Amino acid sequence: MFRQRVFSCLARLRMWVAAGILLACAAIAPGKDIEFGGYTWQIRSGRGGPGPNSWAEDNVWLDASTNLHLKISHRDGHWSCAEITTRQRLGFGRYQFQISGRIDCFDDNVVLGLFNYPTSDVGSDGTHEIDIEFARWGNAHNPMGNFTVWPVEKSLQRETKSFRFGLPGDQTTHRFIWNRTQVLFQSLVGFREDDQEIFSQWVYRPKETDRYISDRPMPVHINLWLFQGRPPKNGLEVEVVLRDFKFTPESQLFRLR
């Protein structure tokens, strides 16, 4: 009887381990690739954070003009989100995103993220990352705009500048310029290559740069998702269009001056 119980427990353990492996694989299922802004991006699928949310390949596509569409969809009673990640890691330089969409009118539970993010060999969640996010984090009284720099060391605090804004139209440009000593954030009205029509700007320049600003190349992420996995309060699907992504290495920025 004892031997039967042992074998039974081992069989159940094998089943639980196998199920865990299957669930883990489902959460990090590799997605198909898409070409945008001169880079190859992997489209996310499966389920996981942030949120957590479900992520669907069908929520990402290019139109005939090679504009990138990201969508939060509601199908068969379930909500799903969109995320893409560059296959290549990028380092110091200017990261610029041109967006079509009324980001100032997002539902309180909608988040648009434009950011780099550490792979496991670079650091853990909550480190190294540089974020531009448009979100009210579920609270209608919060500002919509958020610039954030995460420290190199997990024990340190991130620094964030949040800001309110209203737009005259649906075209905006957002960028961060990252080097060893500072990060400059800018949000501008229209599709721009210059510094005109800035509606928000922040320079993050800490004293201990080696502890607060990463120097490690990282993939770029663009995602459109639901805060804590909550459906939009207005019950509507959300779509954002990116006209372009452009990365300019730091060495080329110096030559442009």
Q: Which role fits each region the language model picked out?
A:
Residues 30-112, 116-119, 126-138, 147-152, ...:
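Low-complexity, Ser/Thr/Pro/Gly-rich disordered linker/stalk regions
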Residues 2-17:
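Bacterial N-terminal signal peptides that target proteins for export
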Residues 97, 115-117, 176-178, 185, ...:
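Tryptophan-centric aromatic hotspots in well-structured domains and transmembrane helices
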Residues 190-217:
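Short, solvent-exposed beta-strand-to-loop segments that form ligand-recognition rims
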Residues 14-16, 20-29:
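Hydrophobic h-region of N-terminal signal peptides that target proteins for export
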Residues 168-184, 188:
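Localized edge beta-strand/strand-to-loop motifs within extracellular or lumenal beta-rich domains
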Residues 85-94, 162-169, 177:
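Extracellular/lumenal carbohydrate-interaction signature centered on repeated Trp-anchored short motifs
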Residues 150-171:
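Short, aromatic/His-centered strand-loop micro-motif at the edge of beta-sheets
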